[in-house]
């Protein structure tokens, strides 16, 4: 059996309450002086108080770490950033952990540091499931991002692109953990170091100092903490400076106010960018993102394939993201879980193979019997199911409107883009409207984030093999006597949402290569029949109390590999200022938050929310390379 699940760290606890790794025979931190040691070795060793205090307004600082463990180093860096870093700056902390701590062990560790309690609480709220790969956690109102890779350190650094301003070399001692402290580690650290990057580690082992020195670090010994005689500090001085290109002026224009556009605008705005959003219609999210309810779910493949990895990563980030930003007085996010029914023999066999061949954490996905699924849903169901506890439903247009209310975002409605023109300076001139109302807007960074805008796109976008997909959802106005007390989202051939007041939303039809957005009675009836296939017990009630049906049709776009297009539209530096986010298909609620993060990371040079090998599979130019 394979699949993405990792084993939790096997711990025991010393008499004074310090966690000990049974696999490595070493402690995670000293119960008496853990924060003090972190402050001395990593914060002072990298001169972070001085550097944070002197950082200019709006600046970005990236810290990379080996050995996340209990998160102590991250929490201490976060606390220091909030104390003396620029209020409008952004701290990006990236780390790796091969054996993640179980949540209950994390809680026990954090109880030792009451001074970090509020930061620790926020970390635990977004702490990821033990699944291999990259996990993104955003603490938006803190100006802090955590990008945590669960897996092997060499695998991580061989498949990501960033330049750190400071390195924390932590983890268990080299004697107990020689696999991590291998010779292959040091060139990877150097390749992920900005000019002037500092490094600090508790160890003064000769091979560590030599490895760092051989790959561009000026290293020296420093007095160690407590009983340790020495530690190592250093500064990176590459023979050929490998600094990333300077950040652009932090202003951008986004075309489109649906899920893709709103998420891109929000990701940039929360990093201090000024964003203008152009929307052709007179309202936000006028197309598919305007549906009255939408489900957050994915359908993972039997194999741990590229598509499954991307969708799983996006789903897990979306779950954390919505839980953080959509906690409003009138909730727009309901994390009620999703049941994917084995609605026919083919799907039943597929689900059986899935669970036979894969290990997933129960908190991500697990099998439910027919009886278990019915008890959870609150209605009688016809089949067993896959259960996604982190799924749920949202109100997409309200979600888009909420994100676009950020003070760094200006939304211009009734602003149809008619043409794009390259300027002599390498930017873009946007032509808006026509006749007397025509306007022009110039920008250096432009992101196209609509499903159907080929008419105004450059030739490179028109060359994308996008196909339209028509979908119609149906809202049923149901008498209270017939309204099911549905507790969770149901998926099969279609989906059914838990009711809002006296309304049920179900859908959606799926018609590839059809761009007709007219509502049809036939599609409403098809959606009703799909609903009754999901919940046959409703047939009698709805026949006694016939519902009123109201449809809403829209057109999405997709690509042949059913992955989105995210990133520079024109490869190379010449196309750096023009990006596209499109082809979300029917998974916009799962994919769009990750897409927004990825675009922001591409523009700022920060660690991406997925591995580089996966980034390559969503770049728009992947079809021109085939």
UniProtKB/Swiss-Prot annotation:
Q: What are the boundaries of the region FAD-dependent cmnm(5)s(2)U34 oxidoreductase?
A: 255-626
Q: What EC identifiers does the entry list?
A: 2.1.1.61, 1.5.-.-
Report keywords, A-Z.
Cytoplasm, FAD, Flavoprotein, Methyltransferase, Multifunctional enzyme, Oxidoreductase, S-adenosyl-L-methionine, Transferase, tRNA processing
Domain of life from the UniProt record: Bacteria
Cofactor(s), by name: FAD
Annotated GO molecular function terms are: flavin adenine dinucleotide binding; oxidoreductase activity, acting on the CH-NH group of donors; tRNA (5-methylaminomethyl-2-thiouridylate)(34)-methyltransferase activity
Question: Annotated region tRNA (mnm(5)s(2)U34)-methyltransferase: where?
Answer: 1-237
Q: Which reaction does it catalyse?
A: 5-aminomethyl-2-thiouridine(34) in tRNA + S-adenosyl-L-methionine = 5-methylaminomethyl-2-thiouridine(34) in tRNA + S-adenosyl-L-homocysteine + H(+)
Disulfide bond entries: none
From which residue to which does the signal peptide run? Answer: none
Q: Where in the cell is it found?
A: Cytoplasm
InterPro entries referenced in this protein's UniProt entry, alphabetically: FAD-dep_OxRdtase, FAD/NAD-bd_sf, MnmC-like_methylTransf, SAM-dependent_MTases_sf, tRNA_MAMT_biosynth_bifunc_MnmC, tRNA_MNMC2, tRNA_S-uridine_synth_MnmC_C
Q: Provide the GO biological process annotations.
A: methylation; tRNA wobble uridine modification
Q: What cellular-component terms does GO give this entry?
A: cytoplasm
Q: What does this protein do?
A: Catalyzes the last two steps in the biosynthesis of 5-methylaminomethyl-2-thiouridine (mnm(5)s(2)U) at the wobble position (U34) in tRNA. Catalyzes the FAD-dependent demodification of cmnm(5)s(2)U34 to nm(5)s(2)U34, followed by the transfer of a methyl group from S-adenosyl-L-methionine to nm(5)s(2)U34, to form mnm(5)s(2)U34.
Similarity comment: family membership: In the N-terminal section; belongs to the methyltransferase superfamily. tRNA (mnm(5)s(2)U34)-methyltransferase family. In the C-terminal section; belongs to the DAO family.
What is the recorded name of this protein? tRNA 5-methylaminomethyl-2-thiouridine biosynthesis bifunctional protein MnmC
Q: Highest lineage ranks of the organism?
A: Bacteria, Pseudomonadati, Pseudomonadota, Gammaproteobacteria, Oceanospirillales
